[in-house]
Amino acid sequence: MNNHQHPASLITSPASRRGFIRGGSALSAVAVALLAGKDVMAQGMKGDTSKDVDILNVALGLEHEAINAYQLGAGSGLLQKPVMDVAVQFQGHHKTHRDALVATIRKLGGQPVAEMKLDEYAKALNAGALKSQGDVLDLAARLELGATNAYLSVIPALGDRELAKVAARLAADETMHYTVLTSALGRPLPPGALSFGA
């Protein structure tokens, strides 16, 4: 992947998300230590950071996508005030995730993938088809579920409990977002246990 490009197909296609999930298991302890803010811990570690940068850039692409999806929803005029407030809050969570990923990529010597223009996300996400608040919430729920599963995929590769906790916290945010959105849509929650990350 070219770190300066951010093709819409990379972040919006299910195949790319599956690739991130498969590749995520190779995320090194160095990258996760930096993502966790454990710079001192990372200094003594060795690892191939180029693969880590690629994996983290895909995660960053997902965060860029989520931030812009919420922006499209907020600017659509379709959201009622209470829903708008929650959307802005969730967008803030994604901005925090983005900032952590950008800092980690830079600490690894990589170039963070650039955010596309809002109209590029609008096209990639088919924002023109959004005709109701339900449509906006459905789009957000689908993206949050994809992000949940992507973040959960990296946890098994982590041997250190503190490092696994970082990935779990990211996944927890995405799961919370998905659950709130699903509930707002009036849909039943997943009927079975262990329904995320499978």
Language-model features, listed with the residues they occupy:
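All-alpha RGS (Regulator of G-protein Signaling) helical domain and cognate RGS-like helical scaffolds
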Residues: 2-11, 25-29, 35-198
